[in-house]
């Protein structure tokens, strides 16, 4: 699996969990102190998050980090 595919799968997982939590991109961006465009870029697989930010995201969304990092083929 290449980097582009992983980023897209990660972004899809973020979007799924965000929607389950009934959060808009704007709300999540505000919670994480980032722009809505950054959240949109993550969900589209165009932004690469650091491990620290991924941990933060999991905490803010109250989800197991493994759900965000589940990369099925």
Q: Where are the predicted features?
A:
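DNA major-groove recognition helix of helix-turn-helix/homeodomain DNA-binding modules
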Residues: 52-67
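Short amphipathic helical patch at the helix-1/turn junction of helix-turn-helix
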Residues: 8, 19-20, 47-48
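Recognition helix of helix-turn-helix/homeodomain-like DNA-binding domains
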Residues: 33-47
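Conserved hydrophobic/aromatic packing and binding residues within compact polymer-binding modules
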Residues: 14, 28-29, 39-42, 68
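Short basic helix-loop element that most often maps to the first helix and adjoining turn
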Residues: 12-31, 56
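Short, charged recognition helix plus adjacent turn
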Residues: 4-5, 67-73
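A detector for short, charged/polar N-terminal pre-domain segments
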Residues: 1-9
């Amino acid at each position: 699996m290449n980097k582009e595919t992983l980023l897209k799968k990660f972004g899809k997982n973020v979007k799924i969990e965000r929607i389950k939590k009934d959060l808009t991109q704007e709300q999540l961006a505000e919670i994480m102190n980032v722009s809505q465009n950054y959240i949109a870029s993550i969900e589209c697989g165009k932004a690469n998050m650091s491990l620290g930010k991924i941990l933060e995201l999991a905490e803010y969304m109250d989800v197991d980090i493994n759900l965000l990092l589940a990369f099925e083929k």
